[in-house]
C-alpha cells in the first residue's frame, strides 16, 4: 500500500484488508483485553476463541504492526493494543537479567484458558454497577457464554456505540472501562498463572527487541528502548561466545550452535535499536554478526543462506528456504538487514551478499510472491534503497531534532541519531558535526548536501509522510 500511495494512486483495497484484519484481531478474542498480548491463533471463524498460548515470536511483529497501523490511521485501538502488548512483555516476559522468555502456556490447573475466563457473577463482584454495565456491554458478558460455559472477553461494541448507548462521552467511557479492566486484572493476578516457558531463544529475542526498540522510538518511551537494550545485552553476554552465537539458554546454561534465523533476526533487531538509541557497541556487534552470516551461512556457489552454518554437524541435506512461515524468512531478514548495514557503512560486501541472495531466491519468489513477503521487502530495499538519514549533534540537540519524527509512518526512511562523541568507523565518522546539528540524507551510496536547518528537517519529514496518511485521520 505504501508504495502505491507514493505514486499518488494508493490501493485502498489492500490497506483496508490489512487494517480490517488487524482491527478484528485487536478487538476480538485473539487479544488479551486485560493483560495485553496476543494468543497464538483462533479456533473459530469469528476469531472469538483462541488457543490461549502466547508466543514471543507472534507478539513482536504484531506489536510493530499495530504501531504502523496507528501511525497510518490515527486509530487509537492500535496504539492501545501496542502499548498493552509492550507492557505485558516487560511485566511477564522479560527476565531480571534482560532476556525475553519464549511463551506462556495455554493451560492452568490442567484446563485450557482457565486463567483468562470469566462469568458475569464474578465480574460483577469486582465492579460497581456502572462499571459492570459498561464492561458487560463492551466485552459480551451480557450475551451467552462463548467457551465451555464461561466467558472469554472480546469487544462487541466500540466506544462510539457505548457512548451512544450510555449517553456518555468517549473519554468517560474509556476512563470507566480502564478502571474496570484494572480491577479485573488485579483479581485475575491472584489466580494460578499459566506455565512459563523460560527458555531464552536468540532468534525470538531478535524479533522482540526490534519491536520494543521500534515502539520506544514511535511512542517516545525510553522504557521500551531500555527493555530492548537489556535483551541485546543479555544475548551478547550469555549467548555470544568466541565470536559466534548460541541459539538458546535457560538459567546459566547456553547451548546449541546458532542458526540463520538467530543471526538474521539479531542483526535486524540491532539495526532497529541503533535507530532508537545509538550505541557504537551495537554497530560493532552488528558488523560481526553480518560477517559470520556471510562467512558461515552463505551458499558460495548459488547465493542465499543455508539454515545451518558450514561447520555445523553434517546433515543429509542442508536446508535453504526462502518462504515465510510462522516467523519471517531468515533469508529475507538477512538480505534486508545486510542491505541496510551496507548502505549505512558504505560497505559493498554486505550489499553484494544481499544481491546474491535475492538472485538465488528469485524463482521461488516468482512462483508464490505472497509467501515471500520478507524477501519482497528486501527486494524493494535493493531496487529502491531506503532514505537513510544520519543526524549528528549533542545528545540534547538530537532529542529535540528527532521529536517531529515520533509517531510518523516512514517505512522507507531510516534515521540514525549519532552523538558527537561516538566512536565510529570511517564512513560514518566522515559525516561530522559542525557548530550545530546536521543531518546527512542518503539513498544507497549517494548523499545530498547536509541539512542544518530545523525547518528543512521538518519539511523533509513532511515530504516523507504526506502521501502515507489516511485522509480521515
Language-model regions, residue ranges each:
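Glycan-recognition and catalytic cores of secretory/periplasmic carbohydrate-active enzymes
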Residues: 1-473
Amino acid at each position: 500500500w505504501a508504495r502505491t500511495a507514493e505514486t499518488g494512486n494508493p490501493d485502498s483495497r489492500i490497506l483496508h484488508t490489512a487494517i480490517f484484519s488487524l482491527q478484528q484481531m485487536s478487538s476480538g478474542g485473539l487479544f488479551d483485553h486485560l493483560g495485553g498480548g496476543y494468543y497464538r491463533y483462533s479456533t473459530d471463524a469469528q476469531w472469538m476463541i483462541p488457543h490461549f498460548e502466547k508466543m514471543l515470536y507472534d507478539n513482536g511483529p504484531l506489536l510493530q504492526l499495530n504501531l504502523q497501523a496507528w501511525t497510518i490511521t490515527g486509530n487509537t485501538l492500535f496504539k492501545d493494543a501496542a502499548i498493552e502488548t509492550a507492557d505485558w512483555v516487560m511485566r511477564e516476559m522479560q527476565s531480571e537479567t534482560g532476556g525475553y522468555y519464549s511463551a506462556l502456556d495455554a493451560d492452568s490447573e490442567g484446563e485450557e484458558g482457565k486463567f483468562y475466563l470469566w462469568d458475569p457473577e464474578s465480574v460483577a463482584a469486582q465492579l460497581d454497577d456502572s462499571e459492570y454495565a459498561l464492561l458487560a456491554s463492551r466485552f459480551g458478558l451480557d450475551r451467552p457464554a462463548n467457551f465451555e460455559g464461561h466467558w472469554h472477553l472480546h469487544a462487541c461494541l466500540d466506544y462510539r456505540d457505548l457512548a451512544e448507548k450510555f449517553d456518555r462521552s468517549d473519554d468517560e467511557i474509556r476512563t470507566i472501562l480502564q478502571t474496570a479492566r484494572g480491577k479485573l486484572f488485579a483479581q485475575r493476578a491472584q489466580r494460578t498463572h499459566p506455565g512459563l516457558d523460560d527458555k531464552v531463544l536468540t532468534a525470538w529475542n531478535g524479533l522482540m527487541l526490534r519491536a520494543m526498540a521500534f515502539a520506544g522510538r514511535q511512542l517516545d518511551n525510553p522504557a521500551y528502548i531500555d527493555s530492548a537494550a537489556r535483551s541485546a545485552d543479555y544475548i551478547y553476554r550469555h549467548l555470544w561466545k568466541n565470536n559466534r552465537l548460541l541459539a538458546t539458554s535457560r538459567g546459566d546454561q547456553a547451548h546449541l550452535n546458532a542458526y540463520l534465523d538467530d543471526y538474521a533476526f539479531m542483526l535486524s533487531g540491532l539495526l532497529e535499536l541503533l535507530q532508537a538509541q545509538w550505541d557504537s557497541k551495537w554497530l560493532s556487534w552488528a558488523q560481526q554478526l553480518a560477517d559470520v552470516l556471510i562467512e558461515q551461512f552463505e551458499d558460495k556457489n548459488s547465493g542465499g543462506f543455508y539454515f545451518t552454518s558450514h561447520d555445523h554437524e553434517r546433515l543429509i541435506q542442508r536446508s535453504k528456504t526462502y518462504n515465510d512461515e510462522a516467523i519471517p524468512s531468515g533469508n529475507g531478514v538477512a538480505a534486508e538487514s545486510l542491505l541496510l548495514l551496507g548502505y549505512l557503512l558504505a560497505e559493498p560486501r554486505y550489499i553484494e551478499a544481499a544481491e546474491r541472495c535475492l538472485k538465488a531466491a528469485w524463482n521461488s519468489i516468482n512462483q508464490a510472491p505472497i509467501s515471500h513477503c520478507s524477501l519482497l521487502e528486501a527486494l524493494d530495499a535493493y531496487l529502491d534503497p531506503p532514505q537513510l538519514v544520519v543526524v549528528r549533534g549533542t545528545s540534547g540537540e538530537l532529542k529535540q531534532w528527532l521529536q517531529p519524527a515520533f509517531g510518523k509512518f516512514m517505512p522507507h526512511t531510516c534515521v540514525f541519531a549519532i552523538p558527537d562523541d561516538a566512536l565510529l568507523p570511517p564512513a560514518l565518522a566522515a559525516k561530522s558535526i559542525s557548530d550545530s546539528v546536521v543531518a546527512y540524507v542518503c539513498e544507497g551510496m549517494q548523499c545530498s548536501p547536509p541539512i542544518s536547518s530545523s525547518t528543512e528537517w521538518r519539511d523533509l519529514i513532511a515530504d516523507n509522510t504526506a502521501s502515507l496518511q489516511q485522509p480521515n485521520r
